[in-house]
Amino acid sequence: QELNTGGVKVSTETILDQHADLVIGYDTGVDRDALRKSGVKMYSTDAMCTDKKPPAPATFSQVKDEVTKVGQIFNVPDKANQVNKDLDAKISGIQKQATSGAKANAVALYITPGSTEFYTYGSSSMIEPMFATNGLQNMYHSNTTRVFDASMEDLLHKNPEWIVLLAGDGEMSKVEPTFLSFKGAKQLKAVKKGHVVTMSFALTDPPTPLTITGTEKLHDLIKDKK
C-alpha cells in the first residue's frame, strides 16, 4: 500500500496483514518478538538501536556502514560499494569548496512551530560531520548526547555565528518565525548577520545517504547567505 507521507507509525498487526518479509525502520509500535515468531525479519539502523551507544564524534563512515549492511541484506554488495564511492566523491567535493582556516561556530536547533521549547545536537549526531565538512564547528561538540534540551539563556551565552534550524518537511516555512519570536533570539549574532538557515531534519539523522544530501544542501544554504 502506498501512502502520501514521508513516514507513518504502523502496528505489528498491520505489518502482518501486509504479509511483509522484511521490515526496515524503528521499533515504535512494533513487537519484535511477535514479528520474529511470524517469520518477519526486522532491521533498524545502529543509530536507532537503544542497546548500542552511538560513536562520538559521529562520522560519515556510519553512513557507508549502513549502505554496506543494506547491500548485504539485499545481496547487492557491488551496488553498495558503488553507492559508497559516489558518496565519498560528494563529500570530497564539499570539503574542497569549504572555507579554509578557522571554523565558524554554529549550532543546530530542532524547532516545533507553536512550541516554546527547542532542542540541539551533540557530537554523536550527524550534525557533527555535516558541520565540520562545511567549515563549521558545533558549539555543543563537548556533549556526546545526540539530542537534548536547549535554552535561550545558553544560546545567548554561546552566541553562535551560524544557526541551522531543523524541522519536519511540512513545517519549514513556520520554523524561522517561531524561532525569532523567542525572547532574546534577535540579540543573537547569527540573527543580526542573517546567518540563520532552515532545512529538513530528514537530511540529518539517522546516518543514511540523505545525510550526505543534507551536507550538500547545507553548503548551498551557507553559500547563499555569504
What are these regions (language model features)?
Residues 1-18, 23, 139:
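A short, structured surface patch at a secondary-structure boundary
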Residues 2-5, 119-148:
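Alpha-helical, coiled-coil/dimerization segments enriched in small aliphatic residues
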Residues 9-19, 33, 37-38, 150-159:
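Short helices/loops that flank or line small-molecule/ion binding pockets
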Residues 22, 29-32, 48-51, 111-117, ...:
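Solvent-exposed loop/turn segments at secondary-structure junctions
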Residues 22-25, 42-45, 105-110, 138-140, ...:
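Structural recognition of the beta-strand scaffold that forms the well-ordered cores
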Residues 32, 36-69:
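Flexible loop/hinge segments that line or gate small-molecule binding clefts
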Residues 58-74, 79-81, 158, 162-226:
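Structured C-terminal subdomain patch of bacterial secreted/periplasmic proteins
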Residues 73-134:
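Basic- and aromatic-lined ligand-binding clefts that recognize polyanionic substrates
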